[in-house]
Amino acid sequence: MQLNWKESGLRWYWVVVVVFLADQLSKQWVLANFDLYESVKLLPFFNFTYVRNYGAAFSFLHDAGGWQRWLFTAVAVGFSVLLTIWLRKQPANMVRLNLAYTLVIGGALGNLIDRLQHGFVVDFLDFYWNTAHYPAFNIADAAIFIGAVLIIIDSFKASSSDDKAIKE
C-alpha cells in the first residue's frame, strides 16, 4: 500500500529545506565577509576560518585532478534520490529514521550546490585544541554526520527489537 505524503516520511522534508537554507546562507555570508584562509577567533577552541575543500570529508581526494567533483556530485544526487524514495515508503511516525534521512539529504544538496557553483565546498567551522585542528567543515557536513549517526543508532535499535521479537 502506497502512503500519501502526509502519512509518509516525506512529511519530514521540511528538515531538508531548513538544513539546505542554513547551509547555503552561512556559506554566502562567509564568501561575502571573509578572504580565503581568513580566520576569526570566536572561542578558545573555535574559529570561523574560510577554506575551500575540493575533496570529500577530511579533504579526501582533494588533489585528484578535478574528476572527483563529478564523482561527489553523482554520489550526492544518487543518495538524495535513494533516500527520498525510502522516505516515501517510510511511515511518518518513524521519527529517528526520517530525521536522519532528511538531514543527510539536506547536507548532500547543500554541498552539491557548492560543487556545481564553485567547483569546491566552502568550509568554515574550525574546532581546535592548542595547535591541533579538526578539519574545517560546514553546516551541511554536520547534518550529514548527525544523520549518519542517527541511521546507525536506528539500525542497532531495530536489530535489538528484532532480537526481542525472535526470542518471544
Swiss-Prot record:
It comes from the Bacteria. It is an enzyme of class 3 (hydrolase). It is a multi-pass membrane protein. One of its GO terms (cellular component) is plasma membrane. The chain crosses the membrane at residues 12-32, 67-87, 93-113, 136-156. It is found in: Cell inner membrane. One of its GO terms (molecular function) is aspartic-type endopeptidase activity. Its EC number is 3.4.23.36. GO terms for biological process: proteolysis. It catalyses: Release of signal peptides from bacterial membrane prolipoproteins. Hydrolyzes -Xaa-Yaa-Zaa-|-(S,diacylglyceryl)Cys-, in which Xaa is hydrophobic (preferably Leu), and Yaa (Ala or Ser) and Zaa (Gly or Ala) have small, neutral side chains. The active site is at residues 123, 141. HAMAP family: LspA. NCBIfam families: lspA. This is Lipoprotein signal peptidase. It comes from Shewanella amazonensis (strain ATCC BAA-1098 / SB2B). The gene is lspA.
